[in-house]
Structures are given as structure tokens and as C-alpha cells.
């Protein structure tokens, strides 16, 4: 059976249509030329409704997602998203709320936001939280802008450098550069942690702060984190916590108590709001009281001791005693860096995170991290004899192995292992990250996977290691069972075709 599904543009046939319109029984109206499309409609698709439906249904059946299988992407926390959270987010009062309907008609939504702010602050050990940033990278940008505003507010104009570990997520240096600051790289030591001597040597009166992920991108806990924070603070800098790996320490360690001044939470990772496919996400941020005046607004706070007019009621309260005990309003901090996003963040994601926290409670959140760490170490230990470890020590929520299989030909690489996993029915782990590890395989199983699932993945990885030694051509040719064989990823990156073009597609098929 031919598994190829051509682009919908190539299925089009002139004269086909999905809807029959009634005969025109009103006068024709001529639209002004300025309102009419000027380019041609050569690529306008003409198909029947069943053909359109079948095309997209076939494509959807090829999707791989967390609802269909194990998704061990390192540094992505692809945990299963509970469906209760989806149900709550779809409540009509939340799903149909409009950000311009005003505080009085948004009390339920504002209460959700206020309680989530409080919960995230408690879980992380920070004083204040803003829910506005739309994703982790935007949360980072928020934090570094707040750092810059904090230093400028103190007339400390020399602090223009941000320290970033060599194992950091790529968004860290990009964030600092976008904020107009200089990036200074800090080396890792042989244990995979920050090299303390290198850190001390790069601190100066120009240091605005340091960005650090803990656990780091090697999946290892920075066990000298308190000293790192003390050293940076001693030099007048601030500590930014990249919360990408927060799933490893819920209920175990609080970044705000360890010495961090600011951190973003990836609600779409740690707090099980769906992610992948472009969003939406949520990069809520927490900070110390000293940085709270610079948070983006508006934020939510509880009103107390005053009457609140409700336009839906004919009888209005005349005193605070008559008012509802739970009343919330939006406000902007006095020295706010301004909005990071229109309105109030991705509200549906906030509802899901709020539900997740209440579903699990304090004990459940700690169990999340304990199980995530256990699962990651189980995989690490079961594969370490065939796939060398990047750093030979206990990991946290994810492990980093090398695709340099013991006994395999030298030309068998991580990309071959990843492609072969597709033939075994698994989504590949993250590959070639962190950049400081040659042939890196970053595996994050999360807490929602069962031992039988982990054992199946381990068995597949061990089978692939055997194939790499005995029949390496299987890896070189993989995937063989997917609808599309191995892609030319270099060409795709260098010559992207981002919209359909018949001529370009014809050249691709001809191998040009």
C-alpha cells in the first residue's frame, strides 16, 4: 500500500467544490479594488468536503503524541496531560471569558490567577509571581529585563554582563543578547557542574547576573548552588533560575530559598499544560520582594475592606460588610517593565496548571519529582553498559548518554540510533544537546510512564545497540517503516520551503 499522502494542493481538481450555494437573489455589489486580493489563485484548492476531511484525517493518524506513545524528549518534560485539566479549562465561564469584560465580570478567572500566583510562589520559595509571559524563553526575557531595570534603578549602569554556563539552553545567551547585555560563558567542571574557579574569575563590577538551570542540562543537580548564589550576590549580581527542569525538585527544593532571585516556570512542562506543535505555553515568573516592583503587569491581587460594585446586580453594596469576601482586581507594579504579552497571559494554560496543583497537593507534587528521578535513573543504569554516560553519576529527571555504542562502527552516530527508534515505535530522545557532550542522547521519561513502558524502551535501545554491532546497515538506512524515509535535514535547514510551491516540489522530487 502506498503510504505517501501528497499535499492537498496536488489533490485539487478544477470544478470540484464542497458547498453548493443558492442562486443569487440580491443585487450584486462591487467591492473597492483596494479590498480585493491582487495575486492569482492558482494554488486555491478545489475539492469536495469528504476529500478534504479524509486528507486531514489521514495526516492526523500519522501524528505521534503523548496520547499515543512514550515521548522521551530530554529537557522537554513530555508528561501525560490529565484530561480532568482539559475539562476544567473548557468550563463555559473560563472558555468564553473575554479579557475586556472588566474586573467585576471576571472574578472567577481572577481568583484562579490569584490562587495560582500564590501556589507557584509557595512551591518555589519566591515572594511574588507574574503569570503574563507566554513561554519559557519569554519568561527568561522578562527576568533579564527586570535585572537590567533593577540595576538602572540603583544607578548601577556598569552591570552589562550576564554569566551563562557552557551547558545552558540556547535561549539563555539569546535572552541576554536581546536585552542588550553581553554574554560571558562559564565552563563546566569534570562532574558536570559549574566550574567554581572559572566562575570566580569571570565575576566583576560589570556582572548583572547569572542564568543557571538547576538541575542543569546534563540532568545533574548543582550541589554547590548555595555557594554559587552567594558568590554572585557578593559581586553585586543577581541569580536567574531557568525553571526548565523544575520537574525534578517539586516539594524537595525551593529555588527562592537556595538563593535565586528570579525564575520562570514552564507551566507547559512541569504543570502539565499541553505543549508541542507551537503552543500555547506559559512561562510564569517568580521573584524576590526586591524585584517585584519590576514585574510585568497587570497582575492580580485581592481587594480587601472596600465595597465592590457588581454591574449584574440591581442592588449595590453600600459598605465593605456588604461586599463579597473574595474580590480581585488587576494592577500594574510601580516600576513595571511593562507588558510582555497582550492581556493576561495564556489563561487556559493557567486554569490547567491550577487544576493540576489541586489534583496532586503538596504530597503528590513531591511524588511527581521522586518518580521522575527514579524513572530517569532506571533507564540510565539499564543502558550504561552499552551507551556511555556523559557524566558517571546519579542523575535527576533526565539522563544524558552518548550514541557511541560499545563495539559499533565509528560511523554509527546518534542520529542513526534516533532514526532506528522510529522503526521500534518510539519517538526519539533529544539528540546532540547539550552541545558540550559529543553524540548526546538526552532521555527524560517523566513520572507518568509505567515500568513496563520503560522496559520496552530499554529493550528497544539494547536491540538497536546489538544491531549497530551485527547489522549496522539497519541503522544507516533507518527509518524503514515510517511513511517518509530519512529526511535531508541539512538541506531543509538551509533551503526551507515554508509554503507550497509546485515548481520547488517538482525539483525536490527530481532530486535537484
Predicted regions and their residues:
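Conserved phosphate/anionic-ligand binding catalytic regions in large, soluble enzymes, centered on
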Residues: 64-85, 132-143, 271-286, 343-349, ...
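Short, flexible loop/turn elements at secondary-structure junctions
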Residues: 77, 135, 168, 216, ...
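General small-molecule cofactor/ligand-binding pocket signal
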Residues: 130, 184-186, 429
Amino acid at each position: 500500500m502506498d503510504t505517501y499522502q501528497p499535499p492537498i494542493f496536488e489533490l485539487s481538481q478544477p470544478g470540484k467544490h464542497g458547498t453548493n450555494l443558492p442562486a443569487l437573489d440580491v443585487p450584486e455589489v462591487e467591492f473597492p479594488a483596494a479590498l480585493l486580493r491582487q495575486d492569482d489563485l492558482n494554488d486555491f484548492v478545489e475539492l469536495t468536503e469528504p476529500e478534504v476531511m479524509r486528507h486531514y484525517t489521514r495526516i492526523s493518524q500519522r501524528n505521534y503524541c503523548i496520547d499515543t506513545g512514550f515521548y522521551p524528549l530530554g529537557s522537554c518534560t513530555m508528561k501525560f496531560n490529565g484530561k480532568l485539566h482539559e475539562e476544567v479549562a473548557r468550563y463555559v465561564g473560563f472558555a468564553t471569558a473575554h479579557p475586556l469584560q472588566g474586573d467585576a465580570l471576571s472574578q472567577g478567572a481572577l481568583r484562579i490567577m490569584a490562587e495560582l500566583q500564590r501556589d507557584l510562589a509557595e512551591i518555589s520559595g519566591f515572594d511574588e509571581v507574574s503569570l503574563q509571559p507566554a513561554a519559557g524563553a519569554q519568561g527568561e526575557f522578562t527576568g533579564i529585563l527586570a535585572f537590567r531595570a533593577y540595576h538602572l534603578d540603583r544607578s548601577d549602569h556598569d552591570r552589562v554582563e550576564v554569566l551563562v554556563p557552557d551547558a545552558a539552553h540556547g535561549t539563555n545567551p539569546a535572552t541576554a543578547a536581546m536585552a542588550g547585555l553581553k554574554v560571558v560563558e562559564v565552563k563546566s567542571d569534570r562532574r558536570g557542574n559549574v566550574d567554581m574557579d572559572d566562575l570566580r574569575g569571570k565575576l566583576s563590577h560589570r556582572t548583572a547576573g547569572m542564568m543557571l538551570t538547576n538541575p542543569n542540562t546534563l540532568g545533574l543537580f548543582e550541589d554547590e548552588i548555595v555557594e554559587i548564589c552567594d558568590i554572585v550576590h557578593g559581586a553585586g549580581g543577581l541569580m536567574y533560575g531557568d525553571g526548565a527542569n523544575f520537574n525534578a525538585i517539586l516539594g524537595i527544593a525551593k529555588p527562592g530559598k537556595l538563593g535565586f532571585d528570579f525564575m520562570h516556570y514552564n507551566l507547559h512542562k512541569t504543570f502539565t499544560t499541553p505543549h508541542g506543535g507551537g503552543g500555547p505555553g506559559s512561562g510564569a515568573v517568580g521573584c524576590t520582594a526586591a524585584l517585584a516592583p519590576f514585574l510585568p503587569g497587570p497582575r492580580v491581587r485581592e481587594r480587601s475592606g472596600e465595597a465592590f460594585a457588581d454591574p449584574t446586580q440591581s442592588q449595590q453594596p453600600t459598605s465593605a460588610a456588604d461586599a463579597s469576601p473574595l474580590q480581585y482586581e488587576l494592577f500594574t507594579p510601580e516600576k513595571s517593565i511593562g507588558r510582555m504579552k497582550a492581556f493576561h497571559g495564556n489563561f487556559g494554560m493557567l486554569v490547567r496548571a491550577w487544576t493540576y496543583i489541586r489534583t496532586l497537593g503538596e504530597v503528590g507534587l513531591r511524588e511527581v519529582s521522586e518518580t521522575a528521578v527514579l524513572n530517569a535513573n532506571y533507564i540510565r543504569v539499564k543502558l550504561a553498559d552499552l551507551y556511555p554516560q556523559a557524566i558517571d553519576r546519579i542523575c535527576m529527571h533526565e539522563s544524558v548518554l552518548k550514541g557511541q555504542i560499545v563495539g559499533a562502527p565509528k560511523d554509527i552516530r546518534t542520529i542513526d540510533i534516533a532514526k532506528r527508534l522510529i522503526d521500534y515505535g518510539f519517538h526519539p530522545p533529544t539528540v546532540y544537546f547539550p552541545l558540550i557532550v559529543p553524540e548526546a542522547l538526552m532521555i527524560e521519561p517523566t513520572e507518568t510512564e509505567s515500568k513496563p513502558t520503560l522496559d520496552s524502551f530499554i529493550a528497544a535501545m539494547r536491540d538497536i545497540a546489538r544491531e549497530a554491532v551485527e547489522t549496522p546497515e539497519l541503522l544507516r538506512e533507518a527509518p524503514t517503516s515510517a511513511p517518509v524515509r530519512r529526511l535531508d535535514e541539512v538541506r531543509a535547514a538551509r533551503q526551507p520551503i515554508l509554503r507550497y510551491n509546485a515548481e520547488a516540489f517538482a525539483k525536490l522530487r527530481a532530486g535537484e
